[in-house]
């Protein structure tokens, strides 16, 4: 098979954020593997860096004629191989294209990474298109756009001699070129968001308010996809600390309370239901009570905001105003209203592993918590807390 180079991923200004580079690898033909142990030992002792370890079980691929010993030689390793290659004739050098992100971690949670194809994946895919040493999209755009980015393999039919050496090419079918993808992300804004997060846990998503196009999507901590793509050497995934979950895309997979961002929606619903108007005044003393003896729902500002109307309540983010408003609404009406704005749904972004948000109802709480819905639950929803996420 002749495999086309994987499609490029660019930004609208032409900046390439995912491309392909040539790397040098070493392989041995499967039929020579058992009889060439001395050559393999010499390779690891005299050519490869000390960090390389030989794992026969990992290398043994029974259904392919090649066994890859190393897939990404450093310049020093390549130089040592050139010196020693006549003493290890069974081990051959071959150039391969590898996926490469020139900006490494910056777009890791958008682009994602490739990985060695699994046995389960091979069951549903063409073996001609995906031999056992293939790299395939595992997450992010690399996975969701795998078919677009991969293209279709061509074929080169060769005549070989008794030793397997090429004599001539009999027939060639040109591979179909893959598609390139252009993203709406803004490089400078993406970089600023990454730097401000400084590898602390968090996420930043920014949309163009006029078009809805995503300009920033950053999740932190992040990781270097090139190590998993095989285009750079580095610590394996197993050696990477998992405590901070660098592979978890907090921007689309994490579920968090919407908090005060929900207040304009609750205010709009209050206007629609004619419970309030733009001049309705609420006395914010720093807490709200349904009754004199009832629980106090405290606002973020201890001494309150004083007399507030809807505009001031949104500008100063008065919790008490929205506690009181939510207490006059029902969870049924709140849920149905928020559903119209996409709450409780997935956005449909063309990335993998997006989590569906939680928009609670009476039945949801009964089924998931095993309890009835209380007015206090509705009050918490009014400021984007409680069961909503």
Task: List each language-model region with its residue ranges.
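Extracytoplasmic/periplasmic proteins that interact with beta-lactams or build/remodel peptidoglycan
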Residues: 1-203, 218-250, 255
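Sequence/structural segment immediately N-terminal to covalent heme-attachment motifs in c-type
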Residues: 206
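Beta-lactam-recognizing serine transpeptidase/beta-lactamase-like catalytic domain environment
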Residues: 18, 160-169, 209-260, 265-389
């Amino acid at each position: 098979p002749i495999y086309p180079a994987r499609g490029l991923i660019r930004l609208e200004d032409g900046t390439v954020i995912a491309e392909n580079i040539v790397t040098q690898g070493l392989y041995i033909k499967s039929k020579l593997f058992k009889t060439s142990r001395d050559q393999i030992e010499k390779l690891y002792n005299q050519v490869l860096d000390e960090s390389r370890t030989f794992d026969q079980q990992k290398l043994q691929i029974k259904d392919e004629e090649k066994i890859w010993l190393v897939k990404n030689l450093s310049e020093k390793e390549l130089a040592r191989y050139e010196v020693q290659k006549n003493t290890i004739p069974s081990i051959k050098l071959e150039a391969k294209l590898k996926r490469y992100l020139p900006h490494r971690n910056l777009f890791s949670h958008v682009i994602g990474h490739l990985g060695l194809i699994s046995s389960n994946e091979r069951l549903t895919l063409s073996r001609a298109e995906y031999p056992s040493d293939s790299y395939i999209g595992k997450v992010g755009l690399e996975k969701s756009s795998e078919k677009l980015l991969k293209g279709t393999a061509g074929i080169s039919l060769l005549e070989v001699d008794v030793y397997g050496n090429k004599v001539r090419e009999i027939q060639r079918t040109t591979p179909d070129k893959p598609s390139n993808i252009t993203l709406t992300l803004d490089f400078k804004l993406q970089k600023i968001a990454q730097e401000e997060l400084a590898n602390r846990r968090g996420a930043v998503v920014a949309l163009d308010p006029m078009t809805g196009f995503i300009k920033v999507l950053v999740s932190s901590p992040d990781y270097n996809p090139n190590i998993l793509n095989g285009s750079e050497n580095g610590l394996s995934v197993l050696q990477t600390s998992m405590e901070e979950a660098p592979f978890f895309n907090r921007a689309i997979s994490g579920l968090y309370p919407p908090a005060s961002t929900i207040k304009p929606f609750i205010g709009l619903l209050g206007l629609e239901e004619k419970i309030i108007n733009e001049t309705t005044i609420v006395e914010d003393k720093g807490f709200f009570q349904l009754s004199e003896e009832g629980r106090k729902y405290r606002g973020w500002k201890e001494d309150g905001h004083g007399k507030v109307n809807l505009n001031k309540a949104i500008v100063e983010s008065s919790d008490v105003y929205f506690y009181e408003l939510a207490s006059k609404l029902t969870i049924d009406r709140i849920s149905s209203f928020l559903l119209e704005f996409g709450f409780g749904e997935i956005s449909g972004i063309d990335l993998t592993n997006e989590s569906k948000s939680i928009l609670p109802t009476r039945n949801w709480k009964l089924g998931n918590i095993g309890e009835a819905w209380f007015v206090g639950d509705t009050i918490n929803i009014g400021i984007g807390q409680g069961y909503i996420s």
